């Protein structure tokens, strides 16, 4: 699987590589995430989605399509994610087949979560029956089925751990890690979080103080209220989180050791959220779940770019 593949979280990054066109061999379908449960996905899409049918050769979406409301000389484009009930879908980049999606699988979720342009074209290899969800339908659906949001996050974190392990084995060129246009919690979400979490959840760190250590167990995720935090793997900075940014959430989901070190670049104020509080927020606040999915998806996209 292409390390920059970011539109099908049922696949593991780097689990399989597509054959070249010259080989004449059908690309292998990548290994599926151990966290993916097709029954949970089907229930969510049936609960909140719309039925779709696509003839053989029909296009679900095209590479570089991006969400737009349309205008006088352009048509509206609404990003949707899909669950395939029957049939097969080919994912192609630059005309080359990357993967094949079959019944029981989902695709197209990255653009719905982040609003980013499509990174591939999805076309029906056979006649397909599917369900679709746009961003509004998706947020409404996870309010009724927060377990799907948890499943999706676990799949993303599974991929992030693979990417982090690959980054740890190589040098990151200076200037490649840093602050970027990451989707962060907006002011309204931050105010809501501060209001709902007690004073004990607020922490302050001095400049250059280590907040969490790579390889150590983790009990909290953090939301930056003031200042900046640098995130590093094996001593190389991979990103910088500013106000509204999050870090440390991965260890709360899989309860594994930290994959990175976080250090206060300036004096910082943080919200510390433990596992039970995090799971409750996801279950009770679909807007929070959607915001966290967006943050994690953007991080996965960015970390993948460091491997390119």
At which residue positions do the language-model features occur?
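Cytosolic regulatory regions built on CNB/CRP/Popeye-like sensor folds
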Residues: 1-308
């Amino acid at each position: 699987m292409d390390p920059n593949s970011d539109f099908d979280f049922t696949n593991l990054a780097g689990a399989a590589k597509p054959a070249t066109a010259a080989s004449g061999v059908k690309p292998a379908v990548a290994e599926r995430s151990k966290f993916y449960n097709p029954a949970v996905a089907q229930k969510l899409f049936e609960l909140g989605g719309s039925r779709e049918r696509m003839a053989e050769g029909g296009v679900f979406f095209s590479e570089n399509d991006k969400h737009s409301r349309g205008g006088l000389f352009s048509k509206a484009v609404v990003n949707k994610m899909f669950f395939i009930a029957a049939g097969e879908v080919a994912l192609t980049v630059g005309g080359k087949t990357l993967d094949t999606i079959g019944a029981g699988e989902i695709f197209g979720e990255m653009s719905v979560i982040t609003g980013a342009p499509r990174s591939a074209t999805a076309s029906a290899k056979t006649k397909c029956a599917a369900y679709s969800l746009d961003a509004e339908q998706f947020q409404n659906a996870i309010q009724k089925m927060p377990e799907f949001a948890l499943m999706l996050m676990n799949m993303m974190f599974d991929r992030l751990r693979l990417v982090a392990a690959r980054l740890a084995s190589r040098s990151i060129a200076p200037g490649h890690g840093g602050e970027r246009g990451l989707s962060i919690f907006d002011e309204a979400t931050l105010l809501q979080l501060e209001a709902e979490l007690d004073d004990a959840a607020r922490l302050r760190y001095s400049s250059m103080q280590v907040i969490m250590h790579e390889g150590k167990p983790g009990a909290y995720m953090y939301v930056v209220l003031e200042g900046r935090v640098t995130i590093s793997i094996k001593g190389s900075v991979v990103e910088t989180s500013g106000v509204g940014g999050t870090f440390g959430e991965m260890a709360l989901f899989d309860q594994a050791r930290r994959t990175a070190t976080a250090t206060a670049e300036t004096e910082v104020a943080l919200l510390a959220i433990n596992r039970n509080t995090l799971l409750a927020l996801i279950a009770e606040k679909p807007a929070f779940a959607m915001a966290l999915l967006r943050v994690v998806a953007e991080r996965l996209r960015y970390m993948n770019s460091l491997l390119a």
